[in-house]
UniProtKB/Swiss-Prot annotation:
<dbReference type="Pfam" id="PF02463">
    <property type="entry name" value="SMC_N"/>
</dbReference>
<keyword id="KW-0238">DNA-binding</keyword>
<keyword id="KW-0742">SOS response</keyword>
<comment type="similarity">
    <text>Belongs to the RecF family.</text>
</comment>
<dbReference type="InterPro" id="IPR018078">
    <property type="entry name" value="DNA-binding_RecF_CS"/>
</dbReference>
<dbReference type="GO" id="GO:0000731">
    <property type="term" value="P:DNA synthesis involved in DNA repair"/>
</dbReference>
<keyword id="KW-0067">ATP-binding</keyword>
<dbReference type="GO" id="GO:0003697">
    <property type="term" value="F:single-stranded DNA binding"/>
</dbReference>
<keyword id="KW-0235">DNA replication</keyword>
<dbReference type="GO" id="GO:0006302">
    <property type="term" value="P:double-strand break repair"/>
</dbReference>
<comment type="function">
    <text>The RecF protein is involved in DNA metabolism; it is required for DNA replication and normal SOS inducibility. RecF binds preferentially to single-stranded, linear DNA. It also seems to bind ATP.</text>
</comment>
<keyword id="KW-0234">DNA repair</keyword>
<dbReference type="InterPro" id="IPR042174">
    <property type="entry name" value="RecF_2"/>
</dbReference>
<keyword id="KW-0963">Cytoplasm</keyword>
<keyword id="KW-0547">Nucleotide-binding</keyword>
<keyword id="KW-0227">DNA damage</keyword>
<dbReference type="GO" id="GO:0006260">
    <property type="term" value="P:DNA replication"/>
</dbReference>
Amino acid sequence: MSLTRLLIKDFRNIENADLALSPGFNFLVGANGSGKTSVLEAIYTLGHGRAFRSLQPGRVIRHEQEAFVLHGRLQGEERETSIGLTKDKQGDSKVRIDGTDGHKIAELAHLMPMQLITPEGFTLLNGGPKYRRAFLDWGCFHNEVGFFTAWSNLKRLLKQRNAALRQVSRYEQLRPWDKELIPLAEQISTWRAEYSSAIAQDMADTCQQFLPEFSLTFSFQRGWEKETDYADVLERSFERDRMLTYTAHGPHKADFRIRADGAPVEDTLSRGQLKLLMCALRLAQGEFLTRESGRRCLYLIDDFASELDDARRGLLASRLKATQSQVFVSAISAEHVIDMSDENSKMFTVEKGKITD
């Protein structure tokens, strides 16, 4: 699906905007602080229920307003879908799909698979394991129907188990939680392992095009010892877990390691190379989704020129065009994106929260 229309009300510094969008490239050009990134963030929020620069809803609601409103129209091959999200300062959300309320944010995420590339996105590579788990979980969410429910139940059970660790004295008292936790943990780990294995060649091929000077390898670590039953791990770790008051092993401790020439990428690659790698991974993930399901990603790219020279920008642009996906790109100057423009693209100018085309 592509986003054909976007309405924004009281989001960041944007009071009102009604944008007719291209199914191809959409460029948002403006000075720093103009609001161009806010447009990208509005699209992201419409598909995720939260902003990517702040987790506190009050910070993205326009000054002295009580709530923001986002509305979009999605055009698929056979039908059009209307979606909407309202969120107030207390964080209460209302999701509307095709005119009916009561929907879940996960439904928006399913309708709008998107990849985000920002200057802060290096955390995928040099941040903690949670960012790389999120990378795998994005793929599992869009690939496995039962993943989101299983993942939500796992989070709930881990929270309950950690609370129980403060109160119990014998492992047998934890068995009611572990009886539910173990099959969920094993299923989620299986999904992650299968996904990381399935997409590995796509990632290797794309990374080779972007960073031919490096040999990159990828490895999934499930969060507990190989060839060890998770039930045994939980029982054996009980005393340590009780002392720590949290569960030290499990899928919530998984990681997806990326190495260049045998060394961690964060220790080997320059900032420009890290950005290229991040772009390559996001592209590979989106292309894999399209090949497996026929669904296309929506790409959000903030500050396109940052860290990339002309040749690398050209390579990224050509690969994005080849996906035939909808792409939103912000830039300080039109000169940075003019080579990407064609007869199907749209150029928006953003100034102090006002957007014109």
